[in-house]
Amino acid sequence: MPNSLIADAVARIRNGQMARLREVTIYHSRVLVEIAALLKEEGYIVGYEVIEIRPSVKRIIIRLKYYCGQPVISKLKLFSRPGKRIYSRACEIPKFYGGLGISVLSTSKGILPSYKAVSSNCGGELLFGVY
């Protein structure tokens, strides 16, 4: 099991997009389910499904999205990692790719995209950016 489930999930999604895979499998956690739901809501993935391999062992299957043969996710950049956490107040949340992409934050209100965190005046840990 990797040290950071979020970093592992971001790497698997990025590698799956570069290899033009239809779906990737990532480890299961409540945070990763919230992240998958957010990516689906924002239109970056087709969908996700939680499967149970055996009792108490679950995985998340993420179906990747393509448009005209090109991946919808062109950049996926990890901000925080276990050795260096990056926190931001609501007024200081950076724009990812000049506002074309979104930054994903872990806040007290759950996992939120940058524009929802700013509108609800809620800062938190910057997890990754997607464009």
From Swiss-Prot:
Keyword Transcription regulation among UniProt keywords: no
GO cellular component, one term: ribonucleoprotein complex
Keywords (A to Z) from UniProt: Ribonucleoprotein, Ribosomal protein, RNA-binding, rRNA-binding
Subunit field text: Part of the 30S ribosomal subunit. Contacts proteins S5 and S12.
Primary gene name: rpsH
Its biological purpose: One of the primary rRNA binding proteins, it binds directly to 16S rRNA central domain where it helps coordinate assembly of the platform of the 30S subunit.
Similarity comment text for this entry: Belongs to the universal ribosomal protein uS8 family.
Official protein name in the record: Small ribosomal subunit protein uS8
Biological processes per GO annotation: translation
GO MF: rRNA binding; structural constituent of ribosome
